[in-house]
Amino acid sequence: MALEIVGAGFGRTGTLSMKTALEQLGFGPCHHMVEVFGRPESVDPWAAAIEGRDVDLDALVDGFRAAVDFPVCAAWSRFADHFPEAKVLLTVRSSESWWRSYEATIGPRIAATDHGEGQSMMTAIREVVFGGRPMDRQHAIEVYEAHNADVILRTPSDRILVYELGAGWEPLCTFLGVAVPDEPFPASLTQG
């Protein structure tokens, strides 16, 4: 099964809600950081993907139709290149809103140096994505904004959806060419 959707949006941009939404629309299973916690054998290969080292990208997402959140967003361009038919989904929110949520949830986990089995992947995110400064507010916001701008710049407009947190079903369903469900959009944000 080839990956059909590459999620390029950072964690804390509604990625867990998006995972649920994509699965409801038939694009599941959808990979998310929560899957890594249940697959410790995937940690080192994900670190390799983030660091740009040789790794079997197909194996990392084997069995998944979509992937969102960290770690895939940290290597989004590798996956977009490897799966040229896949659509790119960039989930976003305001930089200040993202920082507040990130700082209160995943930021300290990324900054920590004691991750046990997840160490190599979290180190890769901390060093490669955030340049070793994941809790430096101004730097992290600049990284977030530069990442989003890079995704938009490098992806053809007919291949990307920039999805603003809270936009509901319509833009997503239009982009994917599927009907809008007759139910509320999933709301899975655990912290601001």
Language model feature labels by segment:
Residues 1-62, 122-131, 181-192:
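PAPS-dependent sulfotransferase catalytic core
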Residues 15, 73-77, 99, 168-172:
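Short, well-ordered alpha-helical microsegments
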Residues 60-83, 88-91:
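Glycine-rich phosphate-binding loop used to anchor ATP phosphates in small-molecule kinases
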Residues 75, 144-151, 168:
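Alpha-helical packing segments of well-folded alpha/beta enzyme cores
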Residues 79-104, 172:
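Conserved phosphate-donor/acceptor-positioning beta-strand/loop module used by diverse small-molecule
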Residues 121-148:
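A conserved mid-domain beta-alpha-beta active-site/ligand-binding segment of alpha/beta enzyme cores
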Residues 135-139, 154-171, 175:
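Phosphate-binding beta-loop-alpha motif at adenosine-nucleotide cofactor sites
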